[in-house]
Amino acid sequence: DYRQRLLNVRVMLSLRKALFDRLLHLPLPRLWDMKTGGILSRLTGDIDTTTGLLQMAVVSPAISVIRLIIAVGLLLSLNWRLALTALAIIPGVLLMSLVFARRVKPIYRSVRKDAEEIDGRVGETFSGIRVVRAFRGEPRERQDYMRGRHTVLRKELFAHRRELVLWGSWGLLMSAVNVAIVWYGGLLYTGGRASIGDIMAFQWYSFLLLNPVWSIVNTFSELQRSLAAMERVFEVLAMDDDKPDRPGAVEAPRVVRELRLENIEFEYRPGLPVVRDLNVTVPGGTVVALVGRSGAGKTTVTDLVARFHDPTGGRILLNGIDIRDLTLRSYRDLLALVQQEVFLFDGSVADNIAYGRHDATQADVEDAARRANAHEFIVRLPEGYETFIGERGVKLSGGQQQRLAIARAILASPQILILDEATSNLDTESEQLIQASMADLLAGRTTFVIAHRLSTIRRADLILLLDEGRVVERGTHRELMAARGGYYDMVVRQMESDAHGVHGGVLQ
């Protein structure tokens, strides 16, 4: 029992490792379709449901088959005619089990899908607990949760009723076998081909046949739940990786001399282009500001540079090499990302700053924090750099979160920086500290910044105004203001808003 349990634990651990690794490398659109609840459901619930599958699918049936072979041998040695009568049960059992599997496994598959939806909803509820409480949504969330759980319960009870039918049918088959043995044994006795003792002994030994057959049927019944969960696990394992390296892929150069986007086209869905005919050459160390209204394609451009997606047309060249001909790992080593909505992990301040540099020393972490103007507030925290900041950094203010994200990017020391500037309004002191740390972050790096603040845009070497995925204007701030086009109109509107105290200096 210990060895079987140990084997189960090792198999489940290997399965979890393989599944987690595959999930880490799935294309982003697939992950977005699965949702967090679906991912957690497969990693935990589905694999937990398969615990003991090896025992059920291999060990128990193997033991039952050995017992079945021994029983058949004994029965044949006693009376081959009666043995054939008893063996007639096996085709009926096989047919009954196949019918049961066809009807029950879809139910269990549906149960796992419903459980996934419930897990996802629970995750959303507690991620947005402020909204739930502010809008008095607790009764609705409780009702939705219980409705989902009752649906799962009804389906499980329905499947269990099907199992009861299977067990009842098995009882009828056993009774039929006993009746057949007595009836046919009586015929053999009257014909002088069997004694009463033979018939009684045969009837007793027939249980040696029926018990392993029943064990196989029972195992087959229990197996359906595990197989439904296992199918969902292997469905993910069978998915293709995000971007496997091309044959002959080479390591990325360590210094960025030029990044060129050449005839770039991209669409999430066929026939709906998001980026069209994008051409731009970015010398190393250049700061490129992407501006434009919401939905213009700014984030998609930065996602293409980061290779979160590959273009559907055109190519991106790093020092003249198509980035798809570089190993993804070495290319991503050149990158750092600062998102508009800062993402911090539920760990210590130091762990979050060093996330991109696992070999960083405490001195490295503190130096990055100082350059991001974060050191002073960090040392005032209860445990300093070892203070745990909660899931998504909920124990920190918005300005503190942004400075930690900047410190993380500074410590990563990237050649290429992708910055989606935060649009949230901050107090004057936080705004000034962040702007000062931004100057350190951008210095000497090839940077693509989705810019919202005029101060950041003015700092850019090249400004691209995007509209419906196309670059409609390009140049420096001075050049575009002199051209008095769409960029000029945006800046004027922003300055008028600032004059009336609107938006807090955020360029919309």
Where are these regions (language model features)?
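Membrane-embedded alpha-helical segments of multi-pass transporters/permeases
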Residues: Y2, L68, V72, L76, ...
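Cytoplasmic juxtamembrane "membrane-exit" helices immediately C-terminal to transmembrane segments
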Residues: Y2, L6, R10, S14, ...
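Transmembrane-helix motif of ABC transporter permease domains
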Residues: D1-L13, D21, W32, T85, ...
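Helix-loop junctions and hydrophobic alpha-helical segments within the transmembrane domains
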Residues: L19, L23, V132, V233, ...
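ABC-type nucleotide-binding domain
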Residues: D245, A252-Q508
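Conserved catalytic Walker-motif region of ABC-type ATPase nucleotide-binding domains
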Residues: L23, Y145, V233, L261-N263
